[in-house]
Swiss-Prot record:
Single GO cellular component term: nucleoplasm
UniProt protein name: Mas-related G-protein coupled receptor member F
Record's keyword annotation contains Glycoprotein: yes
Organism whose genome encodes this protein: Mus musculus
Residue ranges that the UniProt entry lists as topological domain Extracellular: 1-44, 105-123, 182-198, 264-273
Region annotation Disordered: where it falls in the sequence: 318-343
Compartments in which it is found: Cell membrane
Transmembrane in keyword set: yes
Residues in the signal sequence: none
PROSITE patterns, per the entry: G_PROTEIN_RECEP_F1_1, G_PROTEIN_RECEP_F1_2
Glycosylation sites: 4
Protein purpose: Orphan receptor. May bind to a neuropeptide and may regulate nociceptor function and/or development, including the sensation or modulation of pain.
Amino acid sequence: MAGNCSWEAHSTNQNKMCPGMSEARELYSRGFLTIEQIATLPPPAVTNYIFLLLCLCGLVGNGLVLWFFGFSIKRTPFSIYFLHLASADGMYLFSKAVIALLNMGTFLGSFPDYIRRVSRIVGLCTFFTGVSLLPAISIERCVSVIFPTWYWRRRPKRLSAGVCALLWMLSFLVTSIHNYFCMFLGHEAPGTVCRNMDIALGILLFFLFCPLMVLPCLALILHVECRARRRQRSAKLNHVVLAIVSVFLVSSIYLGIDWFLFWVFQIPAPFPEYVTDLCICINSSAKPIVYFLAGRDKSQRLWEPLRVVFQRALRDGAEPGDAASSTPNTVTMEMQCPSGNAS
């Protein structure tokens, strides 16, 4: 079927399955972690439909997050992070949806190849932007909870917007260099350049971003446990941060195993690339569900507006009845922050 012939992750088999495809098409389909696979058969044709359905659901969810966090809910330092995170996830899902649509039909030729190439570039850039935002969220949340007084007194007013802008530019720069050597130059580039770029991106992802998001979360868990022993409720925002980091770590297990086995031990990856892509799409689609589950009130049997649910998910600081707590109410501190902390 056409969907099998045009699957992006199996460039090594495309010329065999579809003789009309050029070598340039094989280069354009290359992306991060396109490595040698144990399984050489193309994925089932139904995979494209699963991708499309999952991406559409994720686009709806992230679109709601963008609307409510951007226009209906008062801006807070952490809502700005979640706003940019939803933007990155939405763009990633859109790029995957476009590729899935092209794979479902008989779209061959230079223009569909160009669309696939642009979609992969956008997907790689937004994927790294979303991943790089998680350490920033984890670190800032950990500092704001453990050292609240110092944090809110020393924190620059536009820190969230500045960090997000810096991470977007960093992701664009890194992925531009990677795509230049691995996609545009192709065989004209030195043989080891693209390989070194893949290794560098993997090190950046697994040995820098992951520890920077895990260690603050561990400190946050210890702090939450201490509060639980003192019978103090933890802020819902803590649950949101821990949940989105956990979802990413679980969904990136296959990606990490493939990368580690291939680049460290030169062992062909046991998991096909469409499986790792599917896990990343699940990660990008799951965050709105995390906000909803964290913000819903179990005591409310009737339907609540989504704006109220999302706003409750961002609840920070001491709950009612914790007035005696020595931890300052960071809700009040956030309300005192100027609303100009825009993205």
